[in-house]
UniProtKB/Swiss-Prot annotation:
This is Chaperonin GroEL 2/3. The keyword Amino-acid biosynthesis does not apply. One of its GO terms (biological process) is protein refolding. PROSITE patterns: CHAPERONINS_CPN60. Pfam families: Cpn60_TCP1 (PF00118). The gene is groEL2. It catalyses: ATP + H2O + a folded polypeptide = ADP + phosphate + an unfolded polypeptide. GO terms for cellular component: cytoplasm. GO terms for molecular function: ATP binding; ATP-dependent protein folding chaperone; isomerase activity; unfolded protein binding. It comes from Paraburkholderia xenovorans (strain LB400).
């Protein structure tokens, strides 16, 4: 086991804070409509230009091991916020930096870190309640477009295309982002269904760049039991090979020799095949398999209906134009099912929704309707160069996640104003002691940080902007894109409540952990042994 380097107290915390600041300072230049670009070197090919906070955070690794710990911890804030809300990564990083910096001053002054953390947690809980109170639901296509545009760094074209996609496939429909072939963004809508089960083996992948298995015009086998014997599968495999078509197997599970044989055939190119687990559990799995069967024109091979896998015929297999199997999702596009049967199935599920008593059942039934009736919208991102295409795709992904979050939990005024208004919930809040009061004041100051950074990136004086916004009420705030003050909701400067909430929660959580850290352990640098100089050559 290699030797470790251990640091305690202030010497440990100061190095962590240095790492936090390096990462946060690199990320926060991207915040707001006037945010700057960050140029990232690649080990091969052209450098990447981005205004996406999480993309910048992911690239940062520091040479000093102790500083790197601080940077990596804050990187978690950005990636966790991106995973949950899809946006707000830069805001979360700015909030975390502010709480850590202010908190460290109090810790250095001798305050109890645990009480500071209790004060911070108490203040954050009150602010989250206030954000929910300020939130308003999102209804119109125009509001969806506004949220998308803000999240895509004030790109209205991206906001509009996302709103159009949601109009076409519904708010619950599946929307994917692909590389376009022209300079303009394009929207393509195809019938399809997505469920949350991915490939059973990574060896089924045939597109290594995207880490997915693409099957064009495949046959689809649906089975409600485990498949472990290859003998049971042989008739279907032979039928698919004769037809010269790829095969998608959806079953309770595929294991043992059956899975091994499928992997070997796939790798050798004998048969393009992918196997996935059936979605859901119990009765819900049966219902979802039946949905897929109706969508693709298949018959579920089930003992309940007297069907046996070893006697399955080509007519009992479903068909689709294309199937995309990802690590955790499968998308069936343009199934060959009969439209009248699909409509009847949707009608039957809608009747079940009316009779459903629990919210959970109702939600799951609505998901099934969306998958059967909604389809898949594909946004094709257009750009002049590959570098621009990658940067634009990142922004479209962000905007798409943000609009979904807005539909889910509503919107609040953007531009850091919602957090500033939420200060009213904690301005008179007190803790159990002076140290907890200090924790509350730390959050009070941190809530100004996003607006200060937005103003600084736009070239304005942060203190003047904060004072002017605080002099107004409600949605009154600073529009950094135009440099004007006014009602931000009316002018379309809005943030999804979920994004703002998640950013603050994650920032406070990680900052609290850093403040209560008293020792750091890292691998000690290895001492390089000096290479002896070569002996001089003798002259003859």
């Amino acid at each position: 086991m290699s030797a470790k380097d251990v640091k305690f107290h202030d010497s440990a915390r100061s190095r962590i804070v240095k790492g936090v600041n390096v990462l946060a300072d690199a990320v926060k230049v991207t915040l707001g409509p006037k945010g700057r670009n960050v140029l990232i070197e690649r080990s091969f090919g052209a450098p990447t230009i981005t205004k996406d906070g999480v993309s910048v955070a992911k690239e940062i690794e520091l040479k000093d091991r102790f500083e790197n710990m601080g940077a990596q911890v804050v990187k978690q804030v950005a990636s966790k916020t991106a995973d949950v809300a899809g946006d707000g990564t830069t805001t979360a990083t700015v909030l975390a930096q502010s709480i850590v910096q202010e908190g460290m001053k109090h810790v250095a002054a001798g305050m109890n870190p645990m009480d500071l953390k209790r004060g911070i947690d108490k203040a954050v809980a009150a602010v989250l309640d206030e954000l929910h109170r300020l939130s308003k639901p999102i209804k119109t296509s125009r509001e969806i477009a506004q949220v998308g545009a803000i999240s895509a760094n004030a790109d209205e074209a991206i906001g509009k295309i996302i709103a159009d996609a949601m109009d076409k496939v519904g708010k619950e429909g599946v929307i994917t982002v692909e590389d376009g072939k022209s300079l303009e963004n394009e929207l393509e809508v195809v019938e399809g269904m997505q469920f949350d089960r991915g490939y059973l083996s990574p060896y089924f992948i045939n597109d290594p760049d995207k880490q997915v298995a693409h099957l064009d015009d495949p046959l689809i086998l649906l089975h409600d039991k485990k498949i472990s014997s290859i003998r049971d599968l042989l008739p279907v495999l032979e039928a698919a090979a004769k037809a010269g078509k790829p095969l998608l197997i959806i079953a309770e599970d595929v294991e043992g020799e059956a899975l091994t044989t499928l992997v070997v055939n796939s790798m050798r190119g004998v048969l393009k095949v992918a196997a996935v687990k059936a979605p859901g559990f119990g009765d819900r799995r049966k219902a979802l398999l039946e949905d897929i069967a109706i969508l693709t024109g298949a018959t579920v091979i089930s003992e309940e209906t007297g069907k046996q896998l070893e006697k399955a015929t080509l007519e009992e297999l479903g068909r689709a134009k294309r199937v995309e199997v990802q690590k955790e999702n499968t998308i069936i596009i343009d199934g060959a099912g009969d439209q009248t049967r699909i409509d009847a199935r949707v009608k039957a599920i809608r009747a079940q929704i009316e009779e459903a008593t629990s919210d959970y059942d109702r939600e799951k039934l609505q998901e099934r309707v969306a998958k059967l009736a909604g389809g898949v919208a594909v946004i094709k991102v257009g750009a002049a160069t590959e570098v621009e295409m990658k940067e634009k795709k990142d922004r479209v992904d962000d905007a798409l996640h943000a609009t979904r979050a807005a539909v889910e939990e509503g919107i609040v005024p953007g531009g850091g104003v919602a957090l500033l208004r939420a200060r009213s919930a904690i301005s008179s809040l007190t803790g159990a002691n002076a140290d907890q009061d200090a924790g509350i004041r730390i959050v009070l100051r941190a809530l100004e940080a996003p607006l200060r950074v937005i103003a600084a990136n736009a070239g304005d004086e942060p203190s003047v902007v904060v004072a002017k916004v605080l002099s107004g009420k409600g949605n009154y705030g600073y529009n950094a894109a135009t440099g004007e003050y006014g009602d931000l909701v009316e002018t379309g400067v809005v943030d999804p409540t979920k994004v703002t909430r998640t950013a603050l929660q994650n920032a406070a959580s990680i900052a609290g952990l850093i403040l209560t850290t008293d020792a750091t352990v890292a691998e000690a640098p290895k001492e390089e042994k000096a290479v002896p100089a070569p002996a001089p050559e003798l002259e003859y």
